[in-house]
Swiss-Prot record:
Residues 261-281 have a biased composition (Basic residues). Belongs to the universal ribosomal protein uL2 family. Residues 12-23 have a biased composition (Polar residues). The gene is rplB. Part of the 50S ribosomal subunit. Forms a bridge to the 30S subunit in the 70S ribosome. InterPro entries: NA-bd_OB-fold, Rib_uL2_dom2, Ribosomal_uL2, Ribosomal_uL2_bac/org-type, Ribosomal_uL2_C, Ribosomal_uL2_CS, Ribosomal_uL2_dom3, Ribosomal_uL2_RNA-bd_dom. The lineage of its organism: Bacteria, Bacillati, Mycoplasmatota, Mycoplasmoidales, Metamycoplasmataceae. This is Large ribosomal subunit protein uL2.
Amino acid sequence: MAVKHYKPVTNGRRNMSSLDYSKNLSGHAPEKSLLVILKKNSGRNNQGKITVRHQGGRVKRYYRIIDFKRNKDDIPATVKSIEYDPNRSANICLLAYADGEKRYILAPEGIKVGQKVVSGNNVDILVGNSLPLSNIPEGTFVHNVEMQPGGGGIIARSAGTSAQILGKDDDGKYVVLRLKSGEMRRILARCRATIGTVGNGEHSLVLLGKAGRSRHLGVRPTVRGSVMNPIDHPHGGGVSKQPIGRKAPLTPWGKKALGVKTRKTKKSSTKLILRRRKDSK
């Protein structure tokens, strides 16, 4: 999918870019039976208190019900359309099964309208097909990977992401995956995954260009703690551009913000991680 750049006719357009959806999407209206109303929470809980900062003010949208489980086995489906989904970075495609049911799935890279896909234990290794990790050869790139059998895909669902199968245990119970973050971990071989890489990989190349586009997405401004009052943030207070006055940066709630591992130490799945993800610098 090509990235469109605009002439600098205004300051907002000067550094703006977007994706050219006309060449890849079908242009069909979404399937009404797979739409539900998406309520705005603006980062508030049932008491009206902010639990997630920097959220609110996005445009109205419907939620598309996505089939992450891919549990309709041995029934072929035809890709009817490839559509835009405002709720995620990846595109989605509408499947029409032979028995008449319709479902949305994440659109893999290279999938075409009219293509056949199928789920099952012993299906072909083709893009869009879903099957257990135990039946997928080593070196294959997969996405929408389950962490619990039958629980639905959790790993590698964003645009352009995938996980690679590196090997299998001698007893066949676990499969070793390398994730996009660089982490290597063991997953139960009975978990399912979909062949291929998630499409719309150019999503990360888009520049919003102005604050208004970020507000349309529901992202509110991020205010630095050093310009707040002392009651609002540990970095607040002082005259003009003073240092934060602490040994290390802190979160708004007074905890160390840098260099601290945030993963719970007693999680049972820690023993399944063979190599930690690469630290971003």
